[in-house]
Amino acid sequence: MSHPALTQLRALRYFKEIPALDSQLLDWLLLEDSMTKRFEQQGKTVSVTMIREGFVEQNEIPEELPLLPKESRYWLREILLCADGEPWLAGRTVVPVSTLSGPELALQKLGKTPLGRYLFTSSTLTRDFIEIGRDAGLWGRRSRLRLSGKPLLLTELFLPASPLY
């Protein structure tokens, strides 16, 4: 199963450098804290609509593959992050199977828990980079994060109802 927002997320084209944009836009796109928390600060109840979750092979993650270790399988999670039931963000997380050891096994068991609620409670979370992307008037970003030094890639597309616009 797929969703049009995930198709658009995969079509994002990334800037080589951070573009000169309005400071309010950059505040959203370069946020280092949890997007879930930011949405909740808007006075909204945040929920997850699951689109797809499970193991995939390299051929299903061509956009992410150059940014992650080459492995036989990856855990893929595609969701819509909703505020008061309205989709504000499409998210795609790709986790190499080698990352799924120890406490990070919990990444497979998030269910309808927003990823940010898990990631940003970890004292071992670091971020390698944030890249800003755009497609058909919508903004997005991707980040390679690390838990205990182990990588995962998170891509987010801000949907039209998001307060980013």
Swiss-Prot record:
GO terms for biological process: pyruvate biosynthetic process; ubiquinone biosynthetic process. Keywords: Cytoplasm, Lyase, Pyruvate, Ubiquinone biosynthesis. Monomer. Belongs to the UbiC family. The gene is ubiC. Pfam families: Chor_lyase. Removes the pyruvyl group from chorismate, with concomitant aromatization of the ring, to provide 4-hydroxybenzoate (4HB) for the ubiquinone pathway. This is Chorismate pyruvate-lyase. Pathway: Cofactor biosynthesis; ubiquinone biosynthesis.
